[in-house]
């Protein structure tokens, strides 16, 4: 991510507020609304579970050892966490073990698959919904005001 090209968003203040209050923040929203871009801006490291490189090696690693993909400089971005639901519990456990604020940002679908998640994350993982900004430019297209939908 080229931080110099990042255009500040209204939601940035909320992300910073939540990171200062919780061990992790889960940013949810529709495709192309800027979840990954916004989260990467607020992160110091990250792993992209949906990256097809190496036959989806990041996803495979997350399935084999969820705790291993959490290693890295914090705040750490876990993009598309819902592709490996046990990552949620791994984040919750890590936040319990190291009670620091702003350790992780998880990004994912508005309607994640909760199958395989054992704990709600209450008090540890704050949920934040993001939506398209009217008139915002998304990669490859322009979003018209009437295209904006609330999550």
PLM regions with names:
Residues 1-151:
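Phosphate-binding site recognition
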């Amino acid at each position: 991510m080229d931080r110099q090209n990042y255009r500040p968003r209204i939601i940035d203040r909320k992300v910073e507020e939540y990171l200062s209050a919780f061990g992790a923040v889960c940013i949810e929203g529709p495709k192309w609304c800027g979840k990954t871009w916004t989260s990467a801006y607020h992160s110091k490291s990250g792993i992209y579970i949906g990256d097809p490189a190496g036959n989806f090696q990041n996803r495979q690693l997350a399935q084999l050892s969820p705790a291993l993909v959490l290693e890295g400089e914090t705040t750490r971005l876990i993009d598309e966490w819902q592709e490996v639901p046990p990552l949620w519990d791994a984040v919750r456990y890590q936040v319990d073990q190291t009670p620091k604020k702003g350790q992780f940002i998880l990004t994912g679908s508005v309607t994640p698959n909760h199958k395989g998640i054992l704990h709600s994350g209450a008090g540890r993982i704050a949920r934040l919904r993001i939506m398209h900004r009217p008139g915002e430019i998304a990669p490859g297209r322009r979003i018209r005001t009437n295209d904006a939908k609330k999550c």
